Amino acid sequence: MTDVLARFNSGKLWDFDGGIHPPEMKSQSNQTPITKAPLTEDFYIPVKQHAGDAGNLLVKEGDYVLKGQPLTQGDGLRMLPVHAPTSGTVIAIAPHIAAHPSGLSELAVHIHADGKDQWREQNPIDDFLSQSAEQLIEKIYQAGIAGLGGAVFPTAAKIDSAQKKVKLLIINGAECEPYITCDDRLMRDNPDEIIEGIRILRYILRPEKVVIAVEDNKPEAVQSIKNALQGANDIEIRVIPTKYPSGAAKQLIQILTGMEVPAGQRSSSIGVLMQNVGTAFAIKRAIINDEPLIERVVTLTGDKIPNKGNQWVRFGTPISFLLKNVGYQYDERLPVFLGGPMMGLTLPNLDAPITKLGNCILAPDHFEYDPQAREQSCIRCSACSDACPVHLMPQQLYWYARSEDHEKSEEYSLKDCIECGLCAYVCPSHIPLIQYFRQEKAKIWEIKDKAKKAEEAKLRFEAKQRRLEREEQARKLRSQRAAEARREELANQKGVDPVKAALERLKQKQAAITEKPKISALKTVVNEKGEVLPDNSEVMALRKARRLARQQAISTENSVLTQVDSGTQSDNSDVQKNPENSTALDGKKAAIAAALARAKAKKLAQNNTESVSDNVTAVKSAVQNTEISAPSDSAEKTETDPKKVAIAAAIARAKAKKAAQNNTESASDNVSAVKSAVQNTEISAPSDSAEKTKTDPKKAAIAAAIARAKAKKLAQQQSNKTE
């Protein structure tokens, strides 16, 4: 920074590479003082008129607004508000044609003027020294002031970021465009207010040096500023050679200090800050007069305009309205430019409004304007590179822009292009290089903006997730605390924790349902010899329990069989005593004995456990096997066979009864008939002669088997018929 001041204090003027001296046409419009443009009936104020984001709307359709009333509200120093240019009613808030070569629309507030031009309440101050630097920066921000030299960067943000870094404050009055004279006339007509605005900036920034730089083709403006200073030495004036584009910020710094601003950095990095003379004037009006930025000086020039000059124009005024008031006659063959011939934009629609960016309306005639020649191929002549004041390679950037190679465009420093138009001016192939560069910049900006928004959305989502997690944890913690407090309260009242008691009951219930005898982990014992052997005591205990259950089942079955046997023996004795009545009595007694056996067996089966039932089944099975094998036994066992025959008959009758219950009534009758036959067979068996008694048990068993088979067959037939 010391080098900057040392170089500036040397009084030397440096030069920059490139640049041209185009024909000068300033005399068309700088011969008369600035006048006020008449007010139109309808204003269209774009909500975004600066380099940054649009503010939030404060008005709605149907609202009545006063002159200077804010229409939007910013959120941060780079989101500038816009203000009502006059009093009137908000007709609509809708897209309106923009002052851009694309012809696209942008959101604007449509105000219908009431003709009163009534100001909102104002609070002017006489002495800005009574305010702090922060208060002054806030006033500049609330006034919506942006750089009026062409960049329209928010002034408050620029000043705030450069505080305590600035050693040299440069006020740019070079105005190098060949047709534009708005700054020239402003310095001639309002030098005192410009000086007052510069002193406000000096008070905020506290630089060591302040200088006003003016090109040598504006002698009247230089003299006017000197007269306003009245010999004060706090502000210097430096007259620089006329050369395009000496009014560009980096080129003017190089002329005054011989230093270049590093690529990708701001001038404050070397201790320099630059403001336009129009911006200094707007700062004075905002601080001293409490007037927001609602108008600016606009140069109306070109041979198609009879009444050339500079006018104070309110923002939102349609360009067509301005041109009509200065005698312009529309000609579709000749374009109208917003800005100068070097950096200006072609307007496809003259209904676009004047904004903070609009410093000149140029309407040339056919003597001044040559139609765009047909674009030809690049011949690699390097004329564009030689003329470029920032040492770029426009021919390479041209190829990358055409092929949309965004990475290469950035690699070759497209962002450092100041869009001065020199490359297109000197190109022998008539290639509109600036158009290609602007389009490429817009595409790169759009890609980065989408990536930025995606990253911001990701950060917002992650922040939301963290917030939701914190809220969920806090909710769970509150619930736990409330539950603990409730349990403590109940425990204090009853002496027992209800939750723990409920859990204990649930565990006991589940254990009772699912409890089964389990063998614990393998245990070992040491015998007398010192050998380690497995401890099978639990397994042996389980086996013993199962064995006792089987024995109990067998004993129960034996008791049933004993009762049946005793009944059979008594029947046989009665038959032997009364042979005449044996046929009638044996059948009845056998039926009674069988019924008693069935009842006792059923009762015992209901009272015993499942294990006992299984053992009973096994015993019955063994008994049946004994029945089948009975005929093959020796003659010595034949005397006890009648008992088994009676058991077999009882089993046959039980099976017949079960089959009868599952089948139809007719099947039941047939089964009953079979049972009667079986009974008759059993009854008639003892009445045979004494010689046949030894063989009767076998025949009885065979007859019982045949009866069972017939009963089963009849039951199956009846079931099939029923189906």
Swiss-Prot record:
Cross-referenced Pfam families: Complex1_51K, Fer4_7, RnfC_N
Signal peptide residue numbers: none
Coiled coil: none
Keyword Ion transport: no
Cofactor stoichiometry and binding remark: Binds 2 [4Fe-4S] clusters per subunit.
Cellular component terms (Gene Ontology): plasma membrane
Binding site for [4Fe-4S] cluster 2: C388, C417, C420, C423
Highest rank taxon of the organism: Bacteria
Family matches, as PANTHER family: ION-TRANSLOCATING OXIDOREDUCTASE COMPLEX SUBUNIT C
UniProt protein name: Ion-translocating oxidoreductase complex subunit C
Organism annotation: Mannheimia succiniciproducens (strain KCTC 0769BP / MBEL55E)
Lineage of producing organism: Bacteria, Pseudomonadati, Pseudomonadota, Gammaproteobacteria, Pasteurellales
